[in-house]
Amino acid sequence: MLELAREGDWEAVNALSVQIHDLHAAWRPDIYFSTEEPLPKALFLEKIRERMLYVAKIDGIVVGYVLLQIMKKDGPGTVEKKQLRLESICVDQALRGHGIGKQMVADVRALAKAFGCRELILGVHAENDHAVGFYQKCGFRIRTINMDMKV
């Protein structure tokens, strides 16, 4: 279902990124603020060049996207590994619940294997119960809990 994004996909991808960004701004106004361009075109084009931005289309219309990043982990006392981080995933809110996101995650998993990664990782806001449940249904496990405190 996923294909490498093209320059002409930017407006559709940016509109989808607004849907996700607005949720983040509502949950964490201390970090995010509302913007009409959460994915600037220059960054969009850079991610395409890096082969890290893919879109899902139905009948030629962009209905979702994924933004990826390859991570290499190593250090004293740790096993060296290459991971694919799912930085962002979005399915148009009007089309959620129809299996599109699940297929996108399956495609990202295949990309991770093709890139030689050992793991597919992501972060999700604790407030986003729907996304946590979705990711768990796709096979992700909760491995780390990040905490913060106001000072």
What does each model-found stretch correspond to?
Residues 79-93, 123, 145-148:
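Conserved acetyl-CoA binding element of GNAT-fold acetyltransferases
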